[in-house]
């Protein structure tokens, strides 16, 4: 994938970049793997706002992705590589030998015609999925399960990858993209390779309207709100926040304040904490 730059024909175009979509082979998704996707606008079933900065955006259909990769022993072949509006990574349509079709996350380097396989006996090849116990130390992986059979939950964004560091009893040590080293059950599955579309992070949105197309609403500073809307609000003119430390809209300390529970059940699985950014 390459980044496409634009001439500054307007203020919105100046500095704007997009993907050239060179890896995409079709713009028509597989109809049998589409599901309706209803917009919530960040509201829950009571109509109350639970997630800020969401609303509007282009209409989408959900692509049903196979995160479990549990079709063991049946070879499949990549039919298309497609754009997915619901995630940063591209997706690949797999045609299996028994006639079934499934979408998977498209790893870096995958092409139309590539053969893939799932299961303990699969080769260590990009796109294949195996239990962690069967993956050699040093292998780069993505789409990692946390519970056997639940489906991949970690390392699914564009350009991300993890690495198998070692094996201890029924656990496998994996270094995640954040630098965190975590123990994961050896029966959990992972896919070989790095997630594709790795230059996604280099894209410059360019203008506010492009964020609105994505369904992202503006983020307003608390200091320009009224006191009943935010702890930083109020005052005459450009007033300071009037607090010892920055606060969230709900009055909790923020910007550097640690929010992780002191006694989290998953602490025993974390060998090394993530790197400070």
Swiss-Prot record:
GO terms for biological process: cytoplasmic translation. One of its GO terms (molecular function) is RNA binding. The keyword Flavoprotein does not apply. Residues 258-277 have a biased composition (Basic residues). The gene is rplB. Part of the 50S ribosomal subunit. Forms a bridge to the 30S subunit in the 70S ribosome. This is Large ribosomal subunit protein uL2. One of the primary rRNA binding proteins. Required for association of the 30S and 50S subunits to form the 70S ribosome, for tRNA binding and peptide bond formation. It has been suggested to have peptidyltransferase activity; this is somewhat controversial. Makes several contacts with the 16S rRNA in the 70S ribosome. Belongs to the universal ribosomal protein uL2 family. The lineage of its organism: Bacteria, Bacillati, Bacillota, Bacilli, Bacillales.
């Amino acid at each position: 994938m390459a980044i496409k730059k634009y001439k500054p024909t307007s203020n919105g175009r100046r500095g704007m970049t997009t993907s050239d979509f060179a890896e995409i082979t079709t713009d028509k998704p597989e109809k049998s793997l589409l599901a309706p996707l209803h917009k919530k606008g960040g509201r829950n079933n009571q109509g109350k706002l639970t997630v800020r900065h969401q609303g509007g955006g282009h209409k989408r259909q959900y692509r049903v992705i196979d995160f479990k990769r549990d079709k063991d022993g049946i070879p499949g072949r990549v039919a298309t590589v497609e754009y997915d509006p619901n995630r940063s990574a591209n997706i690949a349509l797999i045609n299996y030998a028994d006639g079934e079709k499934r979408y998977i996350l498209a790893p870096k380097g995958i092409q139309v015609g590539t053969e893939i396989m799932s299961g303990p006996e699969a080769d260590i090849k990009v796109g294949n999925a195996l239990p962690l116990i069967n993956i050699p130390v040093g292998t780069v992986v993505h789409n990692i399960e946390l519970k056997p059979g639940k489906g991949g939950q970690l390392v699914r964004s564009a350009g991300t990858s993890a690495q198998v560091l070692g094996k201890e009893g029924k656990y496998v040590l994996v270094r995640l993209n954040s630098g965190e080293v975590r123990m994961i059950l050896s029966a959990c599955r992972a896919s070989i390779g790095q997630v594709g579309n790795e230059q996604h992070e280099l894209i410059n949105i360019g203008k506010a309207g492009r964020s609105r197309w994505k369904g992202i609403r503006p983020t307003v500073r608390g200091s320009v709100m009224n006191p009943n809307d935010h702890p930083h609000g109020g005052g005459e003119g450009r007033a300071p926040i009037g607090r010892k430390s920055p606060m969230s809209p709900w009055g909790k300390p923020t910007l550097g304040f640690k929010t992780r529970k002191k006694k989290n059940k998953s602490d025993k699985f974390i060998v090394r904490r993530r790197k400070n950014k």
